Amino acid sequence: MGMRMMFTVFLLVVLATTVVSIPSDRASDGRNAVVHERAPELVVTATTNCCGYNPMTICPPCMCTYSCPPKRKPGRRND
């Protein structure tokens, strides 16, 4: 297959997936709004796990007190 043919197939796939996903967004008609309002309470954040609520996580205690030393940027002089 030539380069032009592969590019045409790629564009057709992108167009097809876009056309298929647009009607499915409209079909929900706001029914997902209840799920999105409830989601933050159900998702456990890394900070909550890290600060002692979940004993199975391994993370430095300085993350809970925000006293971790700043990371050095690679490729720069770190004087």
UniProtKB/Swiss-Prot annotation:
Q: Which Pfam families match?
A: Toxin_8 (PF07365)
Q: Where is the signal peptide?
A: 1-21
The propeptide sits at 22-38, 75-79
Q: Entry's InterPro entries?
A: Conotoxin_a-typ
Where Proline amide occurs along the chain? P74
GO cellular component annotations, sorted alphabetically?
extracellular region
Could you list this entry's UniProt keywords, alphabetically sorted. Amidation, Disulfide bond, Gamma-carboxyglutamic acid, Glycoprotein, Hydroxylation, Ion channel impairing toxin, Neurotoxin, Secreted, Signal, Toxin
Instruction: State whether keyword NADP applies.
Output: no
List residues modified as 4-hydroxyproline.
P40, P55, P60, P61, P69, P70, P74
**Family the UniProt entry places it in:** Belongs to the conotoxin A superfamily.
Q: What is stated about domains?
A: The cysteine framework is IV (CC-C-C-C-C).
What name does the UniProt record give this protein? Conotoxin MIVA
Q: What is the lineage of its organism?
A: Eukaryota, Metazoa, Spiralia, Lophotrochozoa, Mollusca
